[in-house]
Amino acid sequence: SVATRLAGQRRTSPAVAVPRHYRCNDGNGDCRNPSMKTDNVVVDENPPLPRFAQIEPIGRCNLACRMCTVNERIDAVGEMSIDRFRSLLDQLPGLETLHLQGLGEPMLHPAFFDMVELAAARGIRVSANTNLTLLPPARALRCVTCGLASLSVSIDGASREVYQAIRRKASFDKVVRNLDRLMRTRAEHRSRLEVRG
């Protein structure tokens, strides 16, 4: 784990000079040959942990958008357990911003809002992307009360025909209703959730 590897390292370790190798035309394709032109650059042996992370909580989606390859993945697609998510947060103690997104639809994950709450409770600014097809009233309420800072809604078309030609398996009217519900719920609860399109 990241934490295990870094546990014994001092944050004030000295920087070291390492060779920078240039591409070369030495005829034999050995462009990593140390006898080739090099100079020294200073590199910190213990770079700081990231302040931003993007995590894919789930690797599947309820749509079949024309431009997306999620339904053609050959890797094992599943969902991240809440324990694994908590472990990742533990390994990234300096995290300031977290974006929950990948190829999958984050709101398909049964513990999506729990993940947001876990991260937000640590002072992490959490954002996510969504196709907004899965937003009954109870989920709209969770959206504005769980600590989510920003939600980007993917709407690829201003008309029903264009949208549904791109976002296959989605209903334009349903997404517009869900967006309206989200905005009304946000106003009712005076939520600071940023909603972006």
What kind of feature is each model-predicted range?
Residues 126, 130, 179-197:
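Conserved strand-turn element in the central/C-terminal portion of the radical SAM core barrel
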Residues 29-150, 161, 165-166, 173-177:
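Conserved alpha-helical substructure of the radical SAM core
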